[in-house]
Design a protein with these regions (language model features):
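N-terminal pro-sequences and low-complexity stem/linker regions of secreted or lumenal proteins
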Residues: 1-251
Length: 251
């Protein structure tokens, strides 16, 4: 099979059209015929081996029928601010970096999960290359993190170090071996290893996941008490025959 394929449309208008209020009947029209493609087990043996060996969440859907950053906001904060009271509603990728690196100048101002973890005394860190994270770290859109990144007076420098700093997989392994792995860690892959169609491929994504597993299993005692979630923020636009569950319409 062709490993490196181009992505399909996966933004708010085309995703809403493909979903079609749950009918799921307009996928090729909204996202091109390419959206009906798929891989067999022989094409992606590493991913199938993981699925066979570990728990597979086979009812795993996007939180919102749109693109990357909105769904990452749901994962990292629990909302996209649908009422628009704190910089939302977020339906696109406008806030996927700090303003000095091209992000939208307006801040998101609601509270993220990592801030709640910190206030509860739970340790956390983001492992990433801030210069090459495929703009997939949603913390870069939030006022408190942007202020810390810019070194603003009164900002909390810990938010920059833990949330918007650079600590890659070698740092993850070092932390495992030194016994200082946080209680909660987020790992953001570089573009080439993100498994995202276009810049990456299933083979490259498999290699990155294998490196994460190698780091976590470097200390068997750490691995024994670790839960690893391998997560995708959305479907890129490739077809899923199962309609996602939705809340009742307010209308």
């Amino acid at each position: 099979a062709l490993m490196r394929v181009e992505g399909t449309p996966h933004s708010w208008p085309d995703a809403q059209a493909a979903w079609d209020e749950g009918r799921m009947s307009r996928w090729p029209d909204a996202k091109t015929a390419h959206a009906m493609g798929y891989y067999r087990a022989s094409d992606i043996p590493f991913q199938f081996a993981l699925a066979d060996a570990f728990t597979l969440c086979d009812a795993y859907h996007c939180s919102i029928q749109t693109g990357t950053n909105t769904n990452r906001l749901m994962l990292w904060t629990g909302t996209n601010d649908p009422g628009g009271k704190n910089g939302g509603p977020a339906i696109g990728n406008s806030h996927d970096n700090v303003p000095s690196l091209g992000g939208h100048p307006q801040d998101y101002t609601w509270t993220t999960y990592v801030e709640r973890l910190g206030k509860a005394g739970i340790t956390w860190r983001v492992y990433q290359d801030m210069a090459d994270n495929f703009e997939d770290n949603p913390l870069a859109g939030f006022a408190s993190f942007r202020q810390a990144f810019a070194g603003a007076p009164g900002a909390d420098p810990v938010l920059k170090e833990l949330g918007l700093g650079t600590r890659k997989l070698d740092g993850l392994k070092a932390d495992v071996l030194a016994g200082r792995l946080p209680q909660v860690s987020f790992i953001v892959a570089p573009a080439a290893e993100s498994e995202h169609p276009g810049p990456s491929s299933p083979a490259q994504g498999a290699d990155y996941t294998a490196q994460v597993l190698d780091a976590l299993t470097a200390d068997p005692k750490v691995w024994a008490r670790t839960v690893l979630f391998i997560m995708f923020d959305e479907n890129d636009g490739f077809f899923d025959h199962m309609p996602p569950p939705v809340p009742p319409s307010r209308d």
